């Protein structure tokens, strides 16, 4: 499996959070694609 994205932390900027959420969505898509 690819490494899970790390949370930016409490003092992260909104841009960092947006990048993190996009990375999480991509990560979940990779995992579910491999499973089926």
UniProtKB/Swiss-Prot annotation:
GO terms for molecular function: neuropeptide hormone activity; neuropeptide Y receptor binding. GO terms for cellular component: extracellular space. The keyword Cell wall biogenesis/degradation does not apply. It comes from the Eukaryota. It is found in: Secreted. The modification Tyrosine amide is found at residue 36. Its main location: secreted. GO terms for biological process: feeding behavior; neuropeptide signaling pathway. InterPro entries: Pancreatic_hormone-like (IPR001955), Pancreatic_hormone-like_CS (IPR020392). The keyword Ribonucleoprotein does not apply. Pfam families: Hormone_3 (PF00159). Gene3D superfamilies: 6.10.250.900. Coiled coil: none annotated. SMART domains: PAH. Keywords: Amidation, Hormone, Secreted. Belongs to the NPY family. This is Peptide YY-like. It comes from Myoxocephalus scorpius (Shorthorn sculpin). The lineage of its organism: Eukaryota, Metazoa, Chordata, Craniata, Vertebrata.
